[in-house]
Protein backbone atom coordinates (compact mmCIF):
# COMPACT_ATOMS: atom_id res chain seq x y z
CA UNK A 1 0.00 0.00 0.00
CA UNK A 2 1.25 3.44 -0.90
CA UNK A 3 -0.72 6.66 -0.34
CA UNK A 4 -1.30 8.75 -3.45
CA UNK A 5 -0.18 12.36 -3.28
CA UNK A 6 -2.48 15.27 -4.06
CA UNK A 7 -0.22 16.14 -7.00
CA UNK A 8 -0.60 12.64 -8.43
CA UNK A 9 -4.38 12.74 -8.06
CA UNK A 10 -4.51 16.06 -9.93
CA UNK A 11 -3.09 14.23 -12.96
CA UNK A 12 -6.12 11.95 -13.22
CA UNK A 13 -8.20 13.28 -16.11
CA UNK A 14 -11.65 14.62 -15.35
CA UNK A 15 -14.66 12.61 -16.42
CA UNK A 16 -16.40 15.85 -17.37
CA UNK A 17 -19.70 15.43 -19.14
CA UNK A 18 -19.54 11.64 -18.90
CA UNK A 19 -20.69 12.05 -15.29
CA UNK A 20 -23.70 14.25 -16.01
CA UNK A 21 -26.66 12.62 -14.26
CA UNK A 22 -29.04 13.30 -17.16
CA UNK A 23 -26.95 12.80 -20.30
CA UNK A 24 -23.56 11.49 -19.18
CA UNK A 25 -22.35 8.67 -21.39
CA UNK A 26 -20.96 6.70 -18.44
CA UNK A 27 -23.18 7.56 -15.47
CA UNK A 28 -26.68 8.36 -16.76
CA UNK A 29 -27.42 4.84 -18.10
CA UNK A 30 -26.66 3.37 -14.66
CA UNK A 31 -28.99 5.72 -12.76
CA UNK A 32 -31.99 3.40 -12.92
CA UNK A 33 -33.30 0.79 -10.47
CA UNK A 34 -31.10 -2.29 -11.07
CA UNK A 35 -32.15 -4.94 -8.60
CA UNK A 36 -30.51 -8.27 -9.40
CA UNK A 37 -32.47 -10.32 -11.93
CA UNK A 38 -34.61 -7.42 -13.20
CA UNK A 39 -34.75 -5.75 -16.63
CA UNK A 40 -32.92 -2.73 -15.13
CA UNK A 41 -30.05 -4.97 -14.10
CA UNK A 42 -29.85 -6.47 -17.61
CA UNK A 43 -29.89 -2.99 -19.15
CA UNK A 44 -26.96 -1.86 -17.00
CA UNK A 45 -25.01 -5.05 -17.75
CA UNK A 46 -25.49 -4.33 -21.46
CA UNK A 47 -24.25 -0.76 -20.92
CA UNK A 48 -21.04 -2.04 -19.31
CA UNK A 49 -20.38 -4.66 -21.99
CA UNK A 50 -21.12 -2.28 -24.87
CA UNK A 51 -18.77 0.32 -23.39
CA UNK A 52 -15.86 -2.11 -23.17
CA UNK A 53 -16.56 -3.70 -26.57
CA UNK A 54 -16.74 -0.35 -28.36
CA UNK A 55 -14.27 1.82 -26.47
CA UNK A 56 -11.80 -0.70 -25.04
CA UNK A 57 -11.66 -3.65 -27.45
CA UNK A 58 -8.35 -4.95 -26.05
CA UNK A 59 -10.02 -5.70 -22.72
CA UNK A 60 -11.42 -9.20 -22.28
CA UNK A 61 -14.94 -9.66 -20.96
CA UNK A 62 -15.85 -12.54 -18.69
CA UNK A 63 -19.16 -13.38 -17.01
CA UNK A 64 -19.51 -15.22 -13.70
CA UNK A 65 -23.16 -16.18 -13.32
CA UNK A 66 -24.92 -17.75 -10.36
CA UNK A 67 -28.37 -18.05 -8.83
CA UNK A 68 -29.61 -17.93 -5.28
CA UNK A 69 -32.81 -17.84 -3.31
CA UNK A 70 -33.38 -14.75 -1.19
CA UNK A 71 -35.57 -14.02 1.84
CA UNK A 72 -37.69 -11.72 -0.34
CA UNK A 73 -38.21 -14.16 -3.21
CA UNK A 74 -38.81 -17.42 -1.36
CA UNK A 75 -38.24 -20.53 -3.49
CA UNK A 76 -37.56 -18.54 -6.67
CA UNK A 77 -33.92 -18.41 -7.75
CA UNK A 78 -32.60 -14.96 -8.61
CA UNK A 79 -29.87 -14.72 -11.26
CA UNK A 80 -26.69 -12.82 -10.41
CA UNK A 81 -24.08 -11.80 -12.98
CA UNK A 82 -20.61 -10.59 -12.12
CA UNK A 83 -18.63 -8.99 -14.93
CA UNK A 84 -14.85 -9.09 -15.20
CA UNK A 85 -13.10 -6.74 -17.60
CA UNK A 86 -9.40 -7.51 -17.91
CA UNK A 87 -6.42 -6.03 -19.77
CA UNK A 88 -3.28 -8.16 -19.72
CA UNK A 89 -0.04 -8.12 -21.68
CA UNK A 90 -0.67 -9.67 -25.10
CA UNK A 91 2.01 -12.35 -24.59
CA UNK A 92 0.47 -13.98 -21.51
CA UNK A 93 -2.26 -16.57 -21.24
CA UNK A 94 -5.44 -15.08 -19.81
CA UNK A 95 -5.29 -14.87 -16.03
CA UNK A 96 -1.52 -15.40 -15.87
CA UNK A 97 -0.40 -11.84 -15.09
CA UNK A 98 -0.17 -9.80 -11.92
CA UNK A 99 -3.45 -7.94 -11.79
CA UNK A 100 -4.35 -4.68 -10.14
CA UNK A 101 -7.99 -5.36 -9.24
CA UNK A 102 -10.56 -2.58 -8.97
CA UNK A 103 -14.03 -3.55 -7.71
CA UNK A 104 -17.48 -2.01 -7.37
CA UNK A 105 -20.98 -3.45 -7.19
CA UNK A 106 -23.70 -2.32 -9.56
CA UNK A 107 -26.95 -3.67 -8.12
CA UNK A 108 -29.40 -1.41 -6.32
CA UNK A 109 -31.55 -2.23 -3.30
CA UNK A 110 -34.76 -4.24 -3.53
CA UNK A 111 -36.52 -1.80 -1.18
CA UNK A 112 -37.55 0.94 -1.20
CA UNK A 113 -39.18 0.48 -4.61
CA UNK A 114 -37.35 2.34 -7.43
CA UNK A 115 -34.25 2.90 -5.28
CA UNK A 116 -31.32 3.98 -7.48
CA UNK A 117 -28.28 3.92 -5.20
CA UNK A 118 -26.34 6.55 -7.12
CA UNK A 119 -23.43 7.20 -4.78
CA UNK A 120 -23.29 3.68 -3.34
CA UNK A 121 -22.89 1.78 -6.60
CA UNK A 122 -23.69 3.69 -9.81
CA UNK A 123 -21.02 6.38 -9.44
CA UNK A 124 -18.24 3.93 -8.47
CA UNK A 125 -19.03 1.85 -11.57
CA UNK A 126 -18.91 4.92 -13.82
CA UNK A 127 -15.62 5.96 -12.19
CA UNK A 128 -14.09 2.54 -12.89
CA UNK A 129 -15.20 2.76 -16.52
CA UNK A 130 -13.55 6.18 -16.72
CA UNK A 131 -10.38 4.84 -15.09
CA UNK A 132 -10.22 1.96 -17.60
CA UNK A 133 -10.56 4.35 -20.53
CA UNK A 134 -8.01 6.75 -19.01
CA UNK A 135 -5.30 4.13 -18.43
CA UNK A 136 -5.83 2.04 -21.55
CA UNK A 137 -3.38 3.98 -23.73
CA UNK A 138 -0.74 3.77 -20.98
CA UNK A 139 -1.22 0.02 -20.72
CA UNK A 140 -0.79 -0.23 -24.50
CA UNK A 141 2.35 1.90 -24.34
CA UNK A 142 3.78 -0.14 -21.47
CA UNK A 143 3.07 -3.45 -23.23
CA UNK A 144 4.51 -2.17 -26.55
CA UNK A 145 7.69 -0.91 -24.87
CA UNK A 146 8.12 -4.16 -22.95
CA UNK A 147 7.70 -6.17 -26.16
CA UNK A 148 10.22 -3.98 -28.01
CA UNK A 149 12.74 -4.41 -25.20
CA UNK A 150 11.95 -8.13 -25.03
CA UNK A 151 10.95 -7.76 -21.42
CA UNK A 152 8.05 -9.59 -19.91
CA UNK A 153 7.41 -13.25 -19.64
CA UNK A 154 8.19 -13.25 -15.93
CA UNK A 155 5.75 -13.05 -13.07
CA UNK A 156 7.32 -9.81 -11.83
CA UNK A 157 7.03 -8.07 -15.22
CA UNK A 158 3.67 -9.26 -16.53
CA UNK A 159 1.23 -6.69 -15.17
CA UNK A 160 -2.38 -6.05 -16.03
CA UNK A 161 -5.58 -4.55 -14.68
CA UNK A 162 -8.96 -6.11 -14.03
CA UNK A 163 -12.22 -4.45 -13.10
CA UNK A 164 -14.86 -6.50 -11.31
CA UNK A 165 -18.43 -5.21 -11.42
CA UNK A 166 -20.32 -7.34 -8.94
CA UNK A 167 -24.01 -8.12 -8.72
CA UNK A 168 -26.00 -8.96 -5.61
CA UNK A 169 -24.11 -6.98 -2.98
CA UNK A 170 -27.27 -5.50 -1.51
CA UNK A 171 -29.48 -7.34 0.97
CA UNK A 172 -33.01 -8.11 -0.19
CA UNK A 173 -34.58 -7.82 3.28
CA UNK A 174 -31.98 -7.24 6.00
CA UNK A 175 -28.19 -7.37 5.87
CA UNK A 176 -27.00 -10.71 7.23
CA UNK A 177 -24.37 -13.27 6.26
CA UNK A 178 -27.05 -15.01 4.19
CA UNK A 179 -28.89 -11.99 2.77
CA UNK A 180 -26.09 -9.97 1.17
CA UNK A 181 -23.02 -10.32 -1.00
CA UNK A 182 -24.67 -12.84 -3.32
CA UNK A 183 -22.32 -12.08 -6.20
CA UNK A 184 -19.21 -11.49 -4.11
CA UNK A 185 -19.24 -14.74 -2.14
Model-identified regions with their sequence ranges:
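Short coil-to-beta-strand
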Residues: 94-104, 157-162
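Active-site-proximal beta-strand/loop segments in catalytic clefts of secreted hydrolases
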Residues: 64-66, 87-89, 103-107, 164-169
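A non-catalytic alpha/beta surface segment that caps or lines the substrate-entry region
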Residues: 12-95
Amino acid sequence: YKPLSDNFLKLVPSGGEDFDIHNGKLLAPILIPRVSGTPGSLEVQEHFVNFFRKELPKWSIEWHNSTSKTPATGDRDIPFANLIFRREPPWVKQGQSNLLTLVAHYDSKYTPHDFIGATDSAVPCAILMHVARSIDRYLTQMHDEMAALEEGGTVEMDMGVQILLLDGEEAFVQWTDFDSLYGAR
